[in-house]
Every structure is written in structure tokens, then in C-alpha cells.
Amino acid sequence: MKDFIEWKDFTFQYDVQSEPTLKGINLSIPKGEKVLILGPSGSGKSTLGHCLNGIIPNTHKGQYSGIFTINHKNAFDLSIYDKSHLVSTVLQDPDGQFIGLTVAEDIAFALENDVVAQEEMTSIVEMWAKRLEIAPLLSKRPQDLSGGQKQRVSLAGVLVDDSPILLFDEPLANLDPQSGQDIMALVDRIHQEQDATTIIIEHRLEDVLYERVDRVVLFSDGQIIYNGEPDQLLKTNFLSEYGIREPLYISALKNLGYDFEKQNTMTSIDDFDFSELLIPKMRALDLDKHTDKLLSVQHLSVSYDLENNTLDDVSFDLYKGQRLAIVGKNGAGKSTLAKALCQFIPNNATLIYNNEDVSQDSIKERAERIGYVLQNPNQMISQAMVFDEVALGLRLRGFSDNDIESRVYDILKVCGLYQFRNWPISALSFGQKKRVTIASILILNPEVIILDEPTAGQDMKHYTEMMSFLDKLSCDGHSIVMITHDMQLMLEYTDRAIVIDNGLIAADDHPINILSNTELLKKTHLKKTSLFALADRLGISPQKLTQWYIDNQGGKNG
């Protein structure tokens, strides 16, 4: 069926805003197509998704003009009940989507609302649990699962409805690299088996393109900039111009002077012809030069039950000015490590800080030394307004109003939030809330800053601004610890990486060496970046190519 979903000259403006968020949108999506909606923060892509699933106009009110139809019916005339049977949404944060006390109850929720008979309901739940490989988890609490498992449960909970439209709102935001790849493969399989119209809203272009998409729609400032095949988009400079991270191999090939005009297929490195490509001389890997020890963690173990250690005898040192990545699969113990370092979780570790034993610190005393930004911003926010949230720590420490205003404005500008200084936090996106929490910790200037997934949900512009700011802090002597699933971040912006696997340190090395260890990557659910695949095709050292890439990106690493 042609034009299953259609926006024609469609404009939408929230009641609380003075300018339209969507401006003259013309977009048609045929039935069964798989479309990626791409764009920087604030571009309007999430608003488009909210129009599609009924959050607009049922929850978020506003004014619209033009035409928006689903299956040739005015979408805004459909009840939220009717819309729920047309569009199934998998949210960015699966914890916000769970209803049931067990996985089975959660999957069955939509069926219960439709008064499906118990026997049929059980059969449907078991069928989808088996297809999504979560059958052994049916009796578990959703909140106890890993990130990848949570996404599968969320997906099962919407697939039981058999809706013709599947909407994914940044499904990769909180997943380790291998789990993200697995989810994209699963989405592609479901798309093909169900013949569903599949719409993916996502920042991580390269990860989405791991599987085929029919079309990419690029948004900026509420307008469509590009609407076409991914291969053609990758030949343009639109991605870098509009704040979207290019696939690593595309950026590297541009720096190498590769002629894309003769290239038909851009989404697979295997399809490129490198016979005429000239390879410049490349230097050896930079070594970490940090030697001034700031923090020594000795024999850290954490157990949530009597049988298993979440962390088992973890020891490592952290140096002044060092940028350290903590990586590993979902559920490996990375966030537990951060919480233990901040005294949020009882532990018997010995901590030596600036040659002083601080193992008996209170939480308040530890906070003066180590700042921690949580992965989920909603768990940190306590104030209604952006300014008040960022200013709270300074107010509790007795700073003057003038000093508070000056410092808050400075940090908001750095974090790309100055224009929202008088906004209610409830009006911000997930990525914007994340920046608010980062700002609230950075303003206190702790010597060690731990950030749990600092760039999750951030577009390239704000990602680059944030990482450049963290680089400046490290140059000033701050030690930056980043818990991340982003292998490109680890490559470009850290000096060292620790891999956690099942509560143990599996590796502690330079990021490039970590990503060169195929056996380690497979074991710990990490994956090589496309630079390594490109190096294999070019027949050169992946370490040298990666160092060359970093040098040509402005020398951000080191």
C-alpha cells in the first residue's frame, strides 16, 4: 500500500513554545518500509515520533497545520486506543516502559488490556519470548536484567499487539556494542518476518547501518534536509554539517582522499576498491605518559547476595590528568564499580587518595574528591528548573548569588544549555537532561569525575563540545573516568581502558590494544571499530591507522 504514513505541508508548534518544532514537513512512508530518522538534538525527530504514536496531541498539546494521515485516516482524529493498535513504540529507556512485576507479566500487559483469554495469552507470551530468546527470563523481574535483555522484553511487550507500525526511539542508547548489534539484527529480522513498517529514531548511524535500511531521513531545525538512500547520504557532507557522526571508515577514507564518486555501495567496506588509494606514512602508537598517581584502589569486592560477587578483588591505579574508559558488556559490574568508589555501596576496599588513606570517608567527604554523573539523569534531578538544578551544589556550599549566577551561566554555555537556563527540566529531552546532570557535577570542580555513559543520547555537536570540555579538565589535572559503550569515544578521548567482565578486570591497556584483541572483544561483548576492518582491507596495521585517524581528527587523543 502506497503512502501508508504521510505528512503533507505539516507544521507543529507546542503550546509552551514560541516557534514551530516541525516546519512544513512533506514525508511519505509506504507500508513495509524500514526508515531511519536521523538528526541532531532539537531537530524535531522525536516530535515526529510523538505525533506518530499519539503522545502528540494526547499528552503534549500544541497547534498544527497541514495533513498527517495513517492508512489514509487523519492521525489526530484517531483515539489513543486506536493509535495503540496501529503503532507500537519501544522507548529509549526501557525501565520507563515496564509495567509487570515479572517479564511474563510485562509482555502480557497489552493482551490483558485487550481481554485476551488466559490460555491464548500464555501461548502468545511464550511464543514471543522464545522468538526473542528471553524464554528463560519469564519469571525474572525486568529491572534485574541487562540492558540488551531489557530491550528484548520491551520489544516483546509491543510485538504481542501485532501492530503494523513499529517505532524505535533510540534503541541503542544504553547498550553495549555487541548487544546493540544483536538488537539491530533482531529488529531487521522482526521487520522482515512481520512485514511491519519500521521507523528507527537514532543517533548512532553506523550501528543502525549494520543492517539494511530502505531510507534515511535527516532532520535539522524542524525541516527535512535529506530523504533518500543511505549510500547517497554517505557521499555528501550533510552528516558532518548537521552534527551527526559519520561512520568511522567514511571519515578515515575522506581524510585519505578516497574518491567516492565512483563508489556505488557505501555501507559495506568489502565493496570498496582501494587499488588506486595512496597510503601516507603512519607513525606508531602514542603511549600513556601519565605517571603522577592520584588514586589507588585496592582489593575492591562488592556482593549483592551471599553467593556471588558483582565485583571480585578489583585493584587499579588512576593518575592525575588521565582519561580512563571503563568498558564491558551490560551487567559486567561497571556501574557498580563507580558507585562503590563513591561510597554509595558498602565495600571493604582500601582507597589511597593523594597518598592518604580515605577508605573510611563518608559519602559527603568522598563527594568532595570524586564526582559521579549517573547514566539515568532522572535519578539525579531534584529541582524543577534548569538553573536551580545546576546551582544546587554551590548553594549548599554557601556561594554568593552573584558567584553562583556567573558560574552557572559559564557551565551552561559549555554544556550547550544556556538557552534553556530558565526552562523547567520536565520540558527537556533525555539527552538535554543528561547534560544538566553533567553540568551540576562539573560546576563543583572535583578532582576525579566519573561519568556513566556521558554521551548517551547526544548528537555530534554536543558530544564534541562535552568531550572537548572534559579534555580541558584533564589538561588542568582532573582525572576523568568514563563508563561507556562507545568504542569511538574510547579510541579518540581516552588514554587507557579497563575491561570489566563478570566482576573481574579482564584487561587494562591502551584502547587501541584492547580493540586489537579479537578473543577479548568476543568474550566481553565489545567489537572492533570499522577502522580495524578498513585496516584489514588496506593491509596496514590497525594501530597505526587508528593513531593516524586520531591525529587527523585534531589530535584529540593525547
Swiss-Prot record:
Known EC number: 7.-.-.-
GO CC entries: ATP-binding cassette (ABC) transporter complex
Residues engaged in binding ATP 2: G328, K329, N330, G331, A332, G333, K334, S335
Localization of this protein: Cell membrane
Enzyme class: translocase
InterPro entries per UniProt: AAA+_ATPase, ABC_Co_transporter, ABC_transporter-like_ATP-bd, ABC_transporter-like_CS, ABC_transpr_CbiO/EcfA_su, ECF_ABC_transporter_ATP-bd, P-loop_NTPase
Task performed by this protein: Probably part of an ABC transporter complex. Responsible for energy coupling to the transport system.
PANTHER family documented for this protein: ABC TRANSPORTER ATP-BINDING PROTEIN BC_2655-RELATED, HEAVY METAL TRANSPORTER
Protein name (record): Putative ABC transporter ATP-binding protein gbs1680
Source organism of the structure: Streptococcus agalactiae serotype III (strain NEM316)
The organism's taxonomic lineage, starting at the top: Bacteria, Bacillati, Bacillota, Bacilli, Lactobacillales
